[in-house]
Amino acid sequence: MSTVVVDAVEHVVRGIVDNPDDVRVDLVISRRGRTVEVHVHPDDLGKVIGRGGRTATALRKLVAGIGGRGIRVDVVDTDQ
């Protein structure tokens, strides 16, 4: 199930950004649970988050629909 979630998020994010080759989606399993980390080119960060966080919220709803509750989605700021 987890690879389906990662593949779906990667497919959607690659369709949104201007630099699809710089997209990387990882599944991190820790004590806090499962987290899907989305890494994009710094110029595309705003597109993935969206106005008022709408795109990021839609990604979270997509993940909840595919993988069930308990999987977090984090858009990682690669500038830091």
Curated annotation (Swiss-Prot):
Chief place where the protein resides: cytoplasm
Q: Which Pfam families match?
A: KH_KhpA-B
Q: Which SUPFAM superfamilies match?
A: Prokaryotic type KH domain (KH-domain type II) (SSF54814)
One GO cellular component term, please give it.
cytoplasm
InterPro entries per the UniProt record, alphabetical: KH_dom-like_a/b (IPR015946), KH_sf_prok-type (IPR009019), KhpA (IPR020627)
MF terms (GO), sorted A to Z: RNA binding
The record places domain KH at 33-80
Q: Which Gene3D superfamilies match?
A: 3.30.300.20
Q: Where in the cell is it found?
A: Cytoplasm
Alphabetized, the UniProt keywords read: Cytoplasm, RNA-binding
UniProt lists the family membership as follows: Belongs to the KhpA RNA-binding protein family.
Instruction: Briefly state the protein's biological role.
Output: A probable RNA-binding protein.
Q: What is this protein called?
A: RNA-binding protein KhpA
Which species is the source of this protein? Mycobacterium leprae (strain TN)
